[in-house]
Amino acid sequence: MMAKTLQGTQQQYAASGFPTQQYPTSGWTQSAAEILQLDNMDQDTSVVRNIIHRKIVEYLNERKEFCNFDLSFLMEIGKCIDRHLFEKADSKIKYMDLETLRTRLNAIVNSASFRGSMFHWSASAASSKLNSQQLPVMEVPIYHDRVTPGPNNLPSCAYNVSSTQGYNQYENCMGAANFAHSLADKPKQMPERLANTIFTSCASTLPKCSPSIDVLHIGHIKEHFSGDAYQNDSSQPSTSGSSSSLSAVWDQTTCSSAMRTLPMDSFSTVNGQNLSTNNKSLYPTTGQGPLLQQYIECEMKQETWSRSLEQSDQSNITTGNRDLYHAQIHPYINGEHKRDRCIQMKEKLGHTSDHEGFSREKSSNLSNHFMHHQQGFMTNYGACSPVSKTVDRAEQTSNSTVSKPTSPASDGSSGKHYPAKRLKVDVPHLVHVNEMEASKEQQPAANETYASAETVQSEVTNSPTKSPCCTSLGDNIACTDNVHGMDMVRLSGSAVQTEEEFRRENSDIEMKDAKVDLLDQTLSGDSLRARKRRGASVLYALTSEELKDHLCTLNHDTSQSKVPTEELLSVEGLPDQNTCNLCGMERLLFEPPPRFCALCFKIINSTGSYYVEVENGNDKSSICGRCHHLSSAKAKYQKRFSYAETDAEAEWWVQCDKCKAWQHQICALFNPKIVDPEAEYTCAKCFLKEKDNEDVDSLEPSTILGARELPRTRLSDHIEQRLSERLVQERQQRAIASGKSVDEVPGVEGLTVRVVSSADRTLQVQPRFKDFFKKEQYPGEFPYKSKAILLFQKNEGVDVCLFAMYVQEYGSACPSPNQRHVYLAYIDSVKYFRPEIKSASGEALRTFVYHEILIGYLDFCKKRGFVSCSIWTCPSTKRDDYVLYCHPTIQKMPKSDKLRSWYQNLVKKAVKEGVVVERNTLYDFFLQPTNECKTNISAAWLPYCDNDFWPGEAERLLEKKDDDTSQKKETQLGRLLRVAKRDDRKGNLEDILLVHKLGERLRTMKEDFLMLCLQQFCKHCHHPIVSGSSWVCTSCKNFFLCERCYAEELNTPLKDRHPATTKQKHAFERIEEEPLPETDDVDPTMESKYFDSRIDFLKHCQDNQYQFDTLRRAKHSTMMILYHLHDSTCSSCHRAMDQCLAWRCLVCLGCNFCDSCYKQDGESLHIHKLRQKKDHHVLQKYTLQDYLEGLVHASRCFDRSCTSKLCLTLKKLFFHGVRCHTRARGGGGCHMCVFMWKLLFTHSLLCDNADCSAPRCRDIKAYIADRSMTDLSISG
């Protein structure tokens, strides 16, 4: 994450590319009362904290002792003072008191302890600022928050203090003698950097092992910054790789060294020269002579120490990075040489040149646990004790150890933590950036990582270079005041981390053998198979042919949103760091999530103009151009264009451990959620070479859990078996039609049908409809079971989800009119079915397969005892997906007539096979009575299903009826009489009118509402015949009467008998009907928080970029979907399990067992060893106060990567409230909406903020005030 300074505004960008916060760099255009946000004041990103921080800087700048200081240095001092004031304040109100801020500040600054610690900082800062315009620059490493003295610019006072206080000059200069010889920018380009050099004079003022330092892991994560597409045209230094100044940001996991910029009189422009006697010309000839001698002596000592290891492991280093290699050497431990190898030097070495003619060496983030331990800091500072313990344990287990840093990144979806090893985040380009301004120096900003609950969200780490448009972070300064207890850290690009987090992260560090880096050069054959295990990609389970097919299709499946750039040459033989070596593309963009208009709730055109309301630098809401034209508050909206470009997020990357090349995670089919710190990642090309050389075997298929390994049910087995039989028959028909044998005709392979969700739900009847039929005792709710069924197909050895449908099953225990009814709610598919050929009947073969799945499901429901099925054939609109997120661009969305024809062909097949006995429309079956119908038609007889069309329409009609005036009611009564006379119906006149209005609404689109009869219905009473005997007309087709209606038929006059339109009457034949079975589900309940609702599943895919617009993305999305499915259910009993108590296999991916199965079967449950995660997190129970505080936070939080679980929950609740048709009405309604309104009312009663941003807060306050006034007037 980086910040860019444009026209006095510092804008911070999260990894998603969305602006998260904007603060004025100068001036106070808003008062604190207008922008108070008290919910996150414990964070540095708080607006209130930012205001007070800048006020502190303003006051400091007014003092004489700080007037000559650089502004950035004052900002860091102000930050530390602000943190101290916040921690020591009795309350937030006292901390926010701006009137007493100057007094409190002066009390701190005038204290003796503060002034004593600031003495040497002030001298160094002033000296640096005075000489910044004259002196060149060199970079010197700082070990553990301690700056090694520079050659000639260290003030004498600081040098003397270092000497008199017992500083070990050898230890203090060891790192400085071996700094990375990369020249900094010229003074005229970056003068501010020279003014920020601060020296810590003695050990007593050293900060603790920085709990405030941000994470910069040394794994394989790479971050693309703005300007990646213009590497050859920019003159700015790079910061995205290990050779950039990002290496100056300290790694809190490894306590690696940082770089600080120091001016000196002269320095050779030759890169890579050692500070030795042979290079005396590099050192200044005036002043600090003893210091120069110390540098030379230290260099000679380290060369002596490292000579033996240089000879033994010369292949790992180059001449250009000899100094960097020296920095890894440590004194003897237990009589042996130790070498710190956090990562291989060749992974990070290499350099890149810019237009100024200088080069930078790639430096490694060295793990300094051993150095820290040896230099005597662990005994003095409590924050380093975990490091000491880790090193002590490692020394006991191995004579030569290294630290393997891990970067736990939270997975909100499963509650797990996985290391961010090998990942890199691609940050999209900054939007609306002037190219001239892009060449200016940019100031570092507070690092904010994109950490969504279900997306690959990794923290920023070292990465290969290729990002020119960035600034050096080498001027960071760290100091502390041990009297006041403040950590005064000048790290603009870091976030605050507590000491507790530091301890926890260090406790996760795994120590391994340092000689493991030599295995890659020596092992071969069988021994190669015994190295680190794989498991991060499903490609390891593929054959060589499948791998080749997968690689061939990648070049054809790149998205149209790609950013074309020229192919860059590799550096020092390494692969191009900005190009995926699998697909050959650079930066690929995901399809942005759709924006909905806040007024009309329609999707805003992604390529057109729209308007946004900005609050605190973030987009609060968006409206379309049409609503903006009709809006009366146009001033508060800003016009924007094409959010398809501004909202798009770039694909993530991963680096191969073997060839060091970078690939898109999607191309590599890499699953970042199951990365094992001990596992290695090998790209497809390297793995294919190993397979061709017979050096390695692919994983066993059982170790990669795919669609076949999902739990089977009777429903899925029934559909699969029926589909397999029908495909065999269809293939034979194609062979006969083409005159070929069956083997010569292509067949369909690799299909898998699975039920991924089967959850019990309850549908609440909308209150107006319920009250309308209060006399008829209409039920208030309908229980049903929601099921999600998916179809997978093996495509080049990888599962791809092709088809999804959600159904609602109202069983025999459900009250009428939904008893024994099935509602086909949603159907969705993507066009990746293979082979793409025609069936024997002339339709597409994929259509044949989808029809057979639906017919198979209806057949299964019929056998279980269901009697009817309703379907609403409503096509989805563009970018408004039903189930699968983002469809291919080549797939056309069907219009209403096409979709209607598709369902009609389905029904014809079902009728032909006897699955459906009669096909009707909802209008003809219930709303349009025939002469044979002997019962009163009522709206209460229509099946009332969740998210169906007509229940919402009926509620709207009843709501409109309640709003009519008394004058209109007289007209309405006359209309009722006319309708009753015309239709000749009996019953409630209002019910008749409601049916009439529904009929008028459905008549023009009645073909879109199908009513399929799976069993015979009585033509007189319209009830299904579920048991006993029935009577069928011998002359008419499908004319059945139940036993009761047939008895009434015999008692009616002959002229009124069937058929009523003719004089000749038909005879009936008695048929004995077997009673229908109860609809009890034979399959177990399978609940999943991601798949129980199609809204939850769709949002889960949107949040995690599980898209299906290309085949490569469909493969990766399916892989992640399968991972979540396997990870959330027990592999033995297939029941939902508690993730905190799950037992997991370390070999088989996604193989998890619940605690009950493990207690029952133990180790015999699985062939491999199972391990239970010990540091599980207990689910948090929220109180009312938590919800109220979370409501305020969620209403102001526009960060898509917010890690607060309660914030995400409440945002989902708001989203549900917008879409819900049931809502909270009367004494019933949707229980989620009821909870939301109760929460809003409770908040409004307690809220005293006139400008509260919580939803409907002001409206509820006005409503309460009106009610209070009304009550007072009545009582008065």
Curated annotation (Swiss-Prot):
Keywords: Activator, Acyltransferase, Chromatin regulator, Coiled coil, Metal-binding, Nucleus, Repeat, Transcription, Transcription regulation, Transferase, Zinc, Zinc-finger. Residues 391-421 are annotated as: Disordered. This is Probable histone acetyltransferase HAC-like 3. A zinc finger (PHD-type) spans 621-689. Zn(2+) 3 binds at C1130, C1133, C1154, C1157. Its EC number is 2.3.1.48. The keyword Signal does not apply. It catalyses: L-lysyl-[protein] + acetyl-CoA = N(6)-acetyl-L-lysyl-[protein] + CoA + H(+). Residues 704-1130 form the CBP/p300-type HAT domain.
